[in-house]
A protein has these predicted regions:
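Glycine-rich phosphate/diphosphate-binding loop of Rossmann-like nucleotide-binding domains
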Residues: 5-45
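Structural motif
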Residues: 8-11, 37, 44-55, 63-65, 85-88, ...
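Glycine-rich phosphate-binding loop
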Residues: 53-98
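Short, solvent-exposed amphipathic alpha-helical segments in soluble enzyme
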Residues: 25-30, 55, 82-84, 140-142
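Acidic, glycine/proline-rich low-complexity segments that act as flexible tails and inter-domain linkers
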Residues: 3-7, 38, 71, 83, ...
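C-terminal binding/interaction regions
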Residues: 7, 13-20, 24, 96, ...
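Short beta->alpha connector loops at strand-helix junctions that form conserved
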Residues: 13, 40, 69, 90-93, ...
């Protein structure tokens, strides 16, 4: 398996249908000029590839992995079981491709699968379909060692703060 060497974050998902959600994590990282590598790796259909990816992630320069999955959502936990890198899990609300209906559990199945990992293989879990929050959390992890990312995150928070103040002022008019 070939991996890019300069990426700091691995963004993986169980299938191409997850990409519309996981794109939000990539957009956040792109906004901070943080290189990432995006791949589809299925815990159930490509288990050998999953193991290889996880075992080589640190050697290939990754600092954190964002893993999105729907349904039984084993991908984040399986990745976490094969690496010491932090793994951020994104539960994805699954849609039935043929009928365009949401899963019967509304994403709760994925949320519980990812958040209820056994002791020793933890996965940080964000809300259902909240890949952007996974991107922000990955930046916070990277900011521990990178003063430039830390500075950009502080600026981002300040912009959010000002935006809310402006919205509040506009509401009073």
């Amino acid at each position: 398996m070939k991996f890019m060497k300069k990426s700091l974050v691995g963004i993986i998902m169980g299938s191409s249908s997850d990409s519309r959600i996981m794109h939000a994590a990539a957009e956040i990282l792109d906004g901070f000029d943080v290189p990432h590598e995006d791949q589809i790796i299925s815990a159930h259909r490509t288990p050998t590839r999953l193991e290889e990816y996880a075992k080589h992630a640190e050697k290939n320069g990754f600092k954190v992995i964002i893993a999105g999955a729907g349904g039984a959502a084993h991908l984040p936990g399986m990745i976490a079981s094969h690496t010491v890198l932090p793994v951020i899990g994104v539960p994805i609300l699954v849609y039935n491709d043929k009928q365009q209906k949401k899963s019967a559990f509304g994403g709760l199945d994925s949320l519980l699968s990812i958040s209820e990992m056994p002791t020793g293989s933890p996965v940080v879990t964000v809300g259902v379909n909240k890949a952007a929050n996974a991107g922000i959390y990955a930046l916070k992890i990277l900011a521990i060692e990178s003063s430039s990312i830390r500075k950009m995150l502080k600026s981002h928070k300040e912009k959010q703060h000002k935006s809310v103040l402006k919205e509040s002022q506009d509401l009073k008019r």
